[in-house]
Amino acid sequence: MANTITPTPHQLSLPLPLYTAEKIATFTDSRGESFDIMLGADESIVQQLRKKSLDTTDTDLQDNTSDFKRFGGGSYEEWYSKGRTPFALVHQASVALAAFAWFGPKPLGRKSLKYLSEAELKEELNQKEKTWHTLVYRSYLPYRGKGLMGDFIRFAIAEYRKHYPEAKLWVGGNADNAASMGLAERLGFKRRDDLFDAEKNWMAMVQE
């Protein structure tokens, strides 16, 4: 049995107000487990996001993301103010956050917080970009590695492009994060060797 996604009719426009989440689809995985795909993030989702970002036992998350600083120690409101559009995958029975993704304007090749210098961090809120939009995604235990992310992110991309059809998407991260970069490749992203940072082992991939 393959994953199936059943869209929920809606007429939402972006950006959504802060702490707003609307169901846009039902996701049923290959084992028959049901999830809600949410556009936006309400306070319940953000609370889970913060808790998971602070979980130091999740070494994959801590080693490969800036979420401990971004969501655990930082302001969600400030992050959202940068034009971010979040999507959440929420397990229906337990209401647990299974995966989280976001899009938003960001200059091509601009690294995440984990890789920025102090001077670059001070400029983070002053970026002006319209053409290139970043895509970032996370999956959380115990749902990581269960075959959910490809279909979830593919659906999120299609939804986001309805609102921003001219946007060029890019992803970036640790070149050794085979799962994340492999997913990007399966989604049609292509590596940009000219943006590879050998010192920080950071790479970018684009989908134009």
Q: Where does each model-flagged region fall?
A:
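Short glycine-rich hinge loops at helix-strand junctions in the catalytic core
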Residues: 147, 164, 188
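Conserved beta-strand-loop-alpha-helix junction that forms the acyl-donor binding cleft
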Residues: 140-141, 169-181
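GNAT-family acyltransferases
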Residues: 1-141, 197-208
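Alpha-helical interaction/dimerization surfaces of two-component signaling modules
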Residues: 52, 159, 183-187
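Conserved acyl-CoA
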Residues: 124-128, 151-168
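A short glycine-leucine-enriched loop at secondary-structure breakpoints
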Residues: 136, 145-152
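Solvent-exposed beta-strand sheet faces enriched in polar/charged residues
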Residues: 104, 170-172, 192
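Conserved active-site alpha-helix within GNAT-family acetyltransferase domains
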Residues: 150, 175-193
